């Protein structure tokens, strides 16, 4: 073989070997991301547009909004005593829609008049189950508002029902039978109980639209060591994650992490394998503060150091 032919053969061998040795950068990147779990830092008690901006600035990619019904419509409101009013839900939704690149979903924590009794209660709060479908205080109107503003922006919607009697309400019955695109339902408790409620009362909720949460206002209360069979927060969420991996539920969230909960956050992510954590203050609306920033960093920095997680964006669809 002449030197020229040997040179040509050598070049051809290199050209043939290159694509076999080096994978396509684009596909490799997608594959690497696909093997990681999108993780959600959910800002707790976001009741106004300033709180939303602060949460995003601190690193949140999802927000939990406590809501209550009034004759004028739905409002961000936590304790329905007239002292925790925030912005109208319409204004909140519009603000979230503008941040759709950063916010993956909105968790709507539905409050009811049953939470408040006595002379100090806000008598203007209405029971949405007793509102007519066309009334602004109805569940129908709430869903229409979410579908009108959030769904077109690609922001997912999570209806949360927490507390005694919540799943016996007409509001829950309506939502479980009328879920639309981009919507899911969240029930709180140990996974066996949650699945039992879905089976008996929420048959309209498909497994891919089922979400469960478990926790306590102060995360350290009843947290456990993640090795128990159940009951304790970490073990209960670990059991939920196992059910998720079987396809019984779509997402599993824990709550509420605050400043100083870094070790417990790590356990929820690494041992309980949750999809996300509600963080912030225990009983105060969300705002920018060194404590809320620290609580957010506990999640975001842990995820950044992880080999199998990444912080979700608006492009990630949790359900």
From Swiss-Prot:
A motif (SMD-tail) lies at residues 312-319. It is found in: Secreted. Mg(2+) binds at residues 64, 66, 109. GO terms for biological process: lipid catabolic process. GO terms for cellular component: extracellular region. It catalyses: a sphingomyelin + H2O = an N-acylsphing-4-enine 1-phosphate + choline + H(+). InterPro entries: PLC-like_Pdiesterase_TIM-brl. GO terms for molecular function: metal ion binding; sphingomyelin phosphodiesterase D activity. Its EC number is 3.1.4.41. Transmembrane segments: none annotated. Belongs to the sphingomyelinase D/phospholipase D family. This is Sphingomyelinase D. It comes from Ajellomyces capsulatus (strain G186AR / H82 / ATCC MYA-2454 / RMSCC 2432) (Darling's disease fungus).
